[in-house]
A protein has these predicted regions:
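Short glycine/proline-enriched turns and hinge-like loops at secondary-structure junctions
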Residues: 78-80, 98-102, 132
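N-terminal subdomain of lithium-sensitive/metallo-dependent phosphomonoesterases centered on the IMPase/IPPase/PAP
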Residues: 1-91
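Acidic beta-strand-loop-alpha-helix segment within the catalytic core
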Residues: 108-185
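Residues that scaffold the ATP/ADP-binding catalytic core of kinase and kinase-like folds
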Residues: 25, 96, 141
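Flexible, active-site-adjacent loop/turn segments at secondary-structure boundaries
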Residues: 33, 42, 95-96, 102, ...
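Conserved beta-strand segments that form the floor/walls of ligand-binding pockets within enzyme
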Residues: 67, 87, 105, 131, ...
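Residue-level signal for inorganic ion chemistry
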Residues: 22, 48, 59, 94, ...
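Glycine-rich active-site/cofactor-binding loop and its immediate structural neighborhood
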Residues: 84-121
Length: 185
């Protein structure tokens, strides 16, 4: 892998660990999710907060600032000077999380001069990890137990390069849109 390999590994581990924290709350029959409302009236749960804390801590070992959906608001004047930054949505699909329909993800991207150079999407309910890095390609790793921390060698050995051929069994399209409308799958 290229020089982003270490950052990719950090992001993968952070996403999986955040996914575990999310699932611990999601599967707790006693949990009310601690739902609050943000300034824009969108929901915020304790799972959002916990996942954000885990990811922010993991990414703090890198030299890049973190811009998170659930983090503190950072003025554009400050952000505009950043050449590289992490963009994070620790629980993308909070409304779906609350509905308990399983359609939510953990999203982490490293962006250089406005262009993503690596990204990680973890689907904790399905235990599926998608990741990509500039000059490396895109990959899928299935059956990652929430909280399990695979080595980079294990990730390389088990990951499947995307896109896969149409003949590959077990491919699932998780969502599709046409003209801004989500299509049923």
């Amino acid at each position: 892998m290229n020089n982003y390999a270490n950052y990719l590994y950090i992001a993968i581990r952070a996403a999986i660990e955040a996914g575990k924290a999310i699932m611990d709350i999601y599967t707790d029959p006693e949990s009310d999710f601690g739902i609050e409302r943000k300034a824009d009236n969108s929901p915020l749960t304790k799972a959002d907060k916990k996942a954000n804390a885990i990811i922010s801590m993991a990414l703090s070992v890198t030299p890049f600032p973190v811009l998170s959906e659930e983090g503190k608001e950072i003025p554009f004047a400050e952000r505009s000077g950043w050449d590289m930054l992490w963009i994070v949505d620790p629980l993308d699909g909070t409304k779906e999380f609350i509905k308990k329909n399983g359609e939510f993800t953990v999203n982490i991207a490293l962006v250089k001069e406005g262009v993503p150079v690596l990204g990680v999407i973890y689907v904790p309910v399905r235990k599926e990890l998608y990741f990509a890095a500039d000059s490396v390609g895109a990959f899928k790793l299935a059956e990652i137990d929430n909280g399990y921390q695979p080595s980079m060698d294990e990730i390389k050995a088990k990951a499947v390069r995307l896109p896969m051929s149409m003949g590959h069994q077990g491919v699932l399209v998780v969502a599709s849109t046409w003209a801004g409308v989500r299509l049923p799958m």
